[in-house]
A protein has these predicted regions:
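N-terminal phosphate-binding loop and adjacent alpha-helix
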Residues: 29-62
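Conserved NTP-handling cores and scaffolds of large molecular machines
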Residues: 19-21, 59-62, 66, 108-112, ...
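Short, glycine- and charge-enriched coil/turn segments that flank and shape catalytic ligand pockets
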Residues: 19-22, 38-50, 123-131, 175-179
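Amphipathic alpha-helical transducer elements in NTP-driven molecular machines
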Residues: 10, 48-56, 97, 144
Length: 179
């Protein structure tokens, strides 16, 4: 069982997928209005008990015990998350990893906060030889930690944490059997 959980501005959304021979099958889904509609979900500023209760109620409606979820996929969004597509030299994985920290500081404003940085390679750049296109992602460590703490408070074991644009791309790639 894979649980996808999206804590959005107006709704908390969840889907449950089971792996089948042909891919995945949607077996359950749920939707719940957030505790204070139209309030932006900001992991750094939320009243955690409100959100914990709302997600737990949704899980109860869906008959899901958070402690039994083996594969949880969530995403971060909001003003403390930055995503930027950049073009960089094609290089070995180890060098690319080191290079991304430098590139993040150059391309993504993080107001001096300690950042959590990740990236995803889109592929070769069609216009420039020996260059690749990369999605560079950064958020504050405080945002990441607050999201993880929220998930733990609900009873989940945090799994994959994406940012919304990358989550959409990964879902599309996975559904269409793309690399």
């Amino acid at each position: 069982m894979i649980l996808g959980l999206d804590i959005g501005r107006q709704y908390i959304k969840a889907v449950v997928l089971d792996k089948t021979k042909g891919g995945h099958k949607l077996v359950n889904h749920g939707l719940r209005l957030v505790p204070e509609p139209n309030q932006t979900f900001d992991p750094e500023k939320i009243s955690q008990p409100h959100w914990v209760m709302a997600v737990r109620e949704l899980m109860k409606e869906m008959k899901i015990n958070p402690k039994r979820v083996k594969h949880l996929v969530t995403s971060l969004n909001g003003s403390h998350v930055s995503v930027k597509q950049i073009t960089t030299m094609d290089m070995p994985q180890e060098e690319l990893h080191s290079s991304m920290t430098f590139e993040a500081r150059k391309h993504i404003p993080m107001d001096g906060s300690e950042a959590v940085i990740d990236y995803q390679i889109f592929g070769s750049n069609p216009k420039e030889v020996d260059k690749i296109d990369v999605a560079l992602v950064a958020c504050t460590k405080k945002t990441s930690s607050a999201h993880i703490e929220l998930l733990k408070e609900i009873g989940f074991k945090p799994g994959i944490i994406d940012v919304d644009p990358i989550a959409i791309m990964n879902s599309y790639s996975y559904a269409n059997d793309l690399p």
